[in-house]
UniProtKB/Swiss-Prot annotation:
Membership in a protein family: Belongs to the eIF-2-alpha family.
Alphabetic keyword roster: Initiation factor, Protein biosynthesis, RNA-binding
Keyword field contains Coiled coil: no
Domain S1 motif: 12-83
Function: eIF-2 functions in the early steps of protein synthesis by forming a ternary complex with GTP and initiator tRNA.
Membrane spanning residue stretches: none
Gene: eif2a
Short name of any one Pfam family annotated for the protein: EIF_2_alpha
Protein name: Translation initiation factor 2 subunit alpha
Organism: Thermococcus gammatolerans (strain DSM 15229 / JCM 11827 / EJ3)
Gene Ontology terms for molecular function: ribosome binding; RNA binding; translation initiation factor activity
SMART domains named among the record's database cross-references: S1 (SM00316)
Domain of life: Archaea
Subunit structure: Heterotrimer composed of an alpha, a beta and a gamma chain.
Length: 273
């Protein structure tokens, strides 16, 4: 089970917890990411409406996402709230938790590979990477995209060698795909050839960049669709802007007209091989 490097959660943090026992006035929950730590959720923090029976909302053994509203390390008190977590926050926290589970499994594979127990792995790898990146899986994504060398100096070199093939095989990198359309006309006998040449040159130049993929699709005159896949939205936008400037320049010089029509971005994942 993934655990945080910190001993206590911070106020305002969303955590995954397991309902331990329920009382008429509230419930005690085990904080899954903080070993040995429990929190209390008063009945007034269960739902935004009046709660007659707390068991209508939570069950013993149930896993829930709750918000930490107060922490007193000296007394060991942690107050929790379920009603202050909306659906979007719950979804985001569960996604983060799943990423932590995957990172933990990959680290266990690396530990087994070099004959170390997970406590050592947690101390030598998990803690420094979480402190640097906020979450360990984000560190693994960075290594998958930019090379294991980005982790050098953060963790011992023996872990770099053990993690490299594991990250390459199992870590998925989020990529952003944006699409748009160009309306292009060149009123000349060889207008189609001029348009094709402009699109091909723009595409090939963009595809020379690392982790960039550009595709054009003919949609029927005068429309041409462009799909750009990049590591992040800002890079995709940068590439689109560069391509648009190139196409508009070439078409204008040829005596034609070109217009860019924007569409929405899409997010998908690719697996490093």
């Amino acid at each position: 089970m993934p655990r945080k490097a910190r001993e206590y959660p911070e106020e305002g943090e969303f955590v995954v917890a397991t309902v331990k026992n329920i009382h008429p006035y509230g419930a005690f929950l085990i904080l899954d990411e903080y070993p040995g730590k429990e929190g209390f959720m008063h009945i007034s923090e269960v739902a935004p409406t009046w709660v007659k029976n707390i068991r209508d909302y939570v069950k013993e053994g149930q896993k829930v996402v709750v918000k930490v509203i107060r922490v007193d390390p000296e007394k060991g008190h942690i107050d929790l709230s379920l009603k202050r977590v909306n659906q979007q926050q719950r979804k985001a926290k569960l996604q983060e938790y799943k990423r932590a589970q995957k990172a933990e499994n990959l680290l266990k594979m690396a530990a087994e590979k070099i004959g170390k127990d997970f406590e050592t792995a947690w101390r030598e790898v998990w803690v420094p990477l979480e402190e640097e990146y906020g979450e360990v899986y984000a560190a693994f994504e960075d290594a998958a995209q930019n090379g294991i060398e980005v982790l050098k100096g953060l963790i011992p070199d023996e872990w770099l060698d053990a993690l490299k093939p594991i990250i390459e095989a199992y870590v998925e990198i989020p990529t952003v795909t944006i699409d748009a359309e160009f309306e292009i006309t060149v009123p000349k006998p060889n207008g189609i050839e001029i348009i094709k040449e402009a699109l091909i040159r723009a595409r090939d130049r963009a595809n020379e960049e690392k982790d960039i993929d550009v595709k054009f699709t003919y949609q029927g005159a005068p429309r041409y669709r462009i799909d750009i896949t990049a590591p992040d939205y800002y890079k995709a936008e940068e590439v689109l802007e560069s391509i648009a400037e190139e196409i508009l320049r070439v078409i204008k010089e040829a005596g034609g007209e070109a217009t860019l029509i924007r569409k929405e971005k899409r997010i998908r994942k690719i697996k490093r091989r």
